[in-house]
Amino acid sequence: MASRGGGRGCGRGQLTFNVEAVGIGKGDALPPPTLQPSPLFPPLEFRPVPLPSGEEGEYVLALKQELRGAMRQLPYFIRPAVPKRDVERYSDKYQMSGPIDNAIDWNPDWRRLPRELKIRVRKLQKERTTIILPKRPPKTTEDKEETIQKLETLEKKEEEVTSEEDEEKEEEEEKEEEEEEEYDEEEHEEETDYIMSYFDNGEDFGGDSDDNMDEAIY
């Protein structure tokens, strides 16, 4: 049977490394490990590129600055939150940090943009104003006397009206009593006529039967 190695040349490949290329001669000991950080990279000199001179460069620079300013004034520009103060002041709520929709002069062609991006003008809510009514002057003695006179005249008028109503009621009651008396007299006369014409005391009863007394009476 053949051995597992299959001979001397069938093993792993031998690695050859030239130590002299690193700066170490034959028989020299290896240098000790360095425990210090590696030296820093030398600083680079950042020199600005010379600006292009001419009308084209100035136009591009002005256009770029205008675009940046317009982007910062849009409501979609995210700004860092303002830190809240420990002590709130009365004027803080009236100082608006963000831009107002009415102050944005941006009128693009909205037919080419979606409706969601269209700016909607917000209406500021008006604060409720309290109406201060003028104070009425205090009533003087003359005003009091006038009111008392008016009340007295009203009382007199009411008394006159009530007295007239009472008189009318009394007249109506008297008329009703007179009508009732007349009605009673007429009824009394009718009753007496009926008594005089139809009353029979029974004296004439049996006058014709005296001639036939012989008959038996049961």
Curated annotation (Swiss-Prot):
Q: Does the keyword Nucleus apply?
A: yes
> Which cell locations does it reside in?
Nucleus
- Which keywords appear in this protein's UniProt record, sorted alphabetically? Nucleus
List the cysteine pairs that form cystine. none
Outline the segment boundaries, as ranges, of region: Disordered: 130-218
Q: Note whether Nucleus occurs among the keywords.
A: yes
Question: Which Gene Ontology BP terms does the record give?
Answer: transcription by RNA polymerase III
Renumbered to this chain, the Basic and acidic residues biased-composition regions fall at 139-160
Ranges annotated as biased composition (Acidic residues)? 161-193, 201-218
Pfam families xref list: RNA_pol_3_Rpc31
> What PANTHER family does this protein's entry cite?
DNA-DIRECTED RNA POLYMERASE III (PTHR15367), DNA-DIRECTED RNA POLYMERASE III SUBUNIT RPC7-LIKE (PTHR15367:SF4)
Please describe the quaternary structure of this protein: Component of the RNA polymerase III (Pol III) complex consisting of 17 subunits. Pol III exists as two alternative complexes defined by the mutually exclusive incorporation of subunit POLR3G/RPC7alpha or POLR3GL/RPC7beta. Found in a trimeric complex with POLR3C/RPC3 and POLR3F/RPC6. Directly interacts with POLR3C.
Q: Which family does the entry's similarity section mention?
A: Belongs to the eukaryotic RPC7 RNA polymerase subunit family.
Q: What does this protein do?
A: DNA-dependent RNA polymerase catalyzes the transcription of DNA into RNA using the four ribonucleoside triphosphates as substrates. Specific peripheric component of RNA polymerase III which synthesizes small RNAs, such as 5S rRNA and tRNAs.
Q: What is this protein called?
A: DNA-directed RNA polymerase III subunit RPC7-like
Q: Which gene encodes it?
A: POLR3GL
